[in-house]
């Protein structure tokens, strides 16, 4: 999903002559999703918390329980896509696209607790890690974008 959407953002930005904004959105999505997954993998290996005893009734997961990777991914992928839609999609359509994405992220986490493959604290940990990683990704992309804009402005200034 991330790769397809990132390619679509780049292609759409090129067609609309808004390549820079779309490229930053694609970079934000990639950094948020891939980095969040990496951070969750590290956290799972460090914590090593066992799954609830009812794991396997509805679904079985062999890895550690904390933090919930699905909860983290719901935030770093689906909520990130919803935020991108709020910025890039024009008009009222932005709400039709972004609201389901913004709701889907947290719902994924709730479903993991309902299925019995996570404790509720695993879900909260996944949401927290995902939200923190997504926010950090946004800050990094904004710093890169403002630095690039500053360099463009400095290079276009006439010499004194």
Predicted features along the sequence, with ranges:
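Hydrophobic alpha-helical bundle signature of multipass membrane enzymes
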Residues: 1-64, 80-83, 87, 91, ...
